[in-house]
Amino acid sequence: MTSVVVVGTQWGDEGKGKITDFLSADAEVIARYQGGDNAGHTIVIDGKKFKLHLIPSGIFFPQKISVIGNGVVVNPKSLVKELAYLHDEGVTTDNLRISDRAHVILPYHIQLDQLQEDAKGDNKIGTTIKGIGPAYMDKAARVGIRIADLLDKDIFAERLRINLAEKNRLFEKMYDSTPLDFDAIFEEYYAYGQEIKQYVTDTSVILNDALDAGKRVLFEGAQGVMLDIDQGTYPFVTSSNPVAGGVTIGSGVGPSKINKVVGVCKAYTSRVGDGPFPTELFDEVGERIREVGHEYGTTTGRPRRVGWFDSVVMRHSRRVSGITNLSLNSIDVLSGLDTVKICVAYDLDRKRIDYYPASLEQLKRCKPIYEELPGWQEDITGVRSLDELPENARNYVRRVGELVGVRISTFSVGPGREQTNILESVWASI
């Protein structure tokens, strides 16, 4: 029984897809356990970029099983589009499995997402308008439609009719918006269900059988710990649990079967959307990091907010997600800076704190306390070991590990597979 969970430790976009792809080489099953197509991950294979939003990164290994777990909310339209994209690129999807217990995103979820966000005005959350939140709302309210329901024509029609009638009343009475047509949605989405039914199964059985047989299973999280609905910067969060604990709920695998948790972070910090960001940069250094790091959302295309590495955030993520190993990405983006900074604590009302406050009002008053380190000018994109890094870059990597309190297993100096350097094999240490 061998399993590893990959989680983002910041606000998403840390390079989880790249690390999952890297670790997938030694895994036999790769599974997603939460989120939806609001998450974007980019994988570079032989210099070619592949952008996925829903299907696990392991799909590029045809001999390995890729699982969309029950904790994922699935937009069938997006899924069918993504499958077609992969087929056009010559990628087989015969190894994909989708949980029959996963909930379905339908057009009324997306419309409600947009209307709710518009109604918030200046207090908007910064949602991707993918219908994720409303789909999880229906799940919690016990009125959601699952993949198993989507495949049953009569059940789907019955539940869609009830849900749509309720949502249309909401659209018309509360938001003065146009109602949606039952027949159009039913025909389109039932057809999508028929297109994906070959992949649908009880994925909890597949995952547990694999673990019981001694196979290596890799669990892939979406977003990041700081977007977790319980542990993140609420309410500027996603609607699910990206923390490692979300694996057990979102995959149907018990906590006793989780061995390692790899936290993925960048050598700096980025964030899409609104919400607290203590180390955010508004100067030319921030703009340089954004441009060099290509910090634009995979899903939205929006410019990401960027800032210095925040070890307070990272220690919070380590604690609430039980991180055992760290993967440090995008060190190369900091090349060329005379000085690099790491936030080691916050100043809250002239008192030094090293925890991440739950209160948004307190966070607004938090000022980062920085430790400055000398930068490096060298191009490090061709580095293939820690010893090859310039001394200042090497010291930066070591200091990050010390401040977070977790050993660094891999570090990356670019987006390619070959630019990921191993310091310690996660699989071998289990």
From Swiss-Prot:
Pathway: Purine metabolism; AMP biosynthesis via de novo pathway; AMP from IMP: step 1/2
Cofactor binding: number and manner: Binds 1 Mg(2+) ion per subunit.
Binding site for Mg(2+): 13, 40
Residues that, per the record, bind substrate: 298-304
GO molecular function (one): GTP binding
Protein location: Cytoplasm
Nucleotide-binding keyword on record: yes
GO cellular component, one term: cytoplasm
Keywords on record: Cytoplasm, GTP-binding, Ligase, Magnesium, Metal-binding, Nucleotide-binding, Purine biosynthesis
Single biological process term from Gene Ontology: IMP metabolic process
Enzyme class per UniProt: ligase
Primary location: cytoplasm
Cofactor: Mg(2+)
Pfam families the UniProt entry points to: Adenylsucc_synt
InterPro entries named in the record: Adenylosuccin_syn_GTP-bd (IPR018220), Adenylosuccin_syn_Lys_AS (IPR033128), Adenylosuccinate_synth_dom1 (IPR042109), Adenylosuccinate_synth_dom2 (IPR042110), Adenylosuccinate_synth_dom3 (IPR042111), Adenylosuccinate_synthetase (IPR001114), P-loop_NTPase (IPR027417)
Enzyme Commission numbers on file: 6.3.4.4
Residues the record marks as active site: 13 (proton acceptor), 41 (proton donor)
Reactions it catalyzes: IMP + L-aspartate + GTP = N(6)-(1,2-dicarboxyethyl)-AMP + GDP + phosphate + 2 H(+)
Binding site for IMP: 13-16, 38-41, 128, 142, 223, 238, 302
UniProt binding sites for GTP: 12-18, 40-42, 304, 330-332, 412-414
HAMAP family according to UniProt: Adenylosucc_synth
Function per UniProt: Plays an important role in the de novo pathway of purine nucleotide biosynthesis. Catalyzes the first committed step in the biosynthesis of AMP from IMP.
Similarity comment: Belongs to the adenylosuccinate synthetase family.
Subunit structure: Homodimer.
Name of the protein this chain belongs to: Adenylosuccinate synthetase
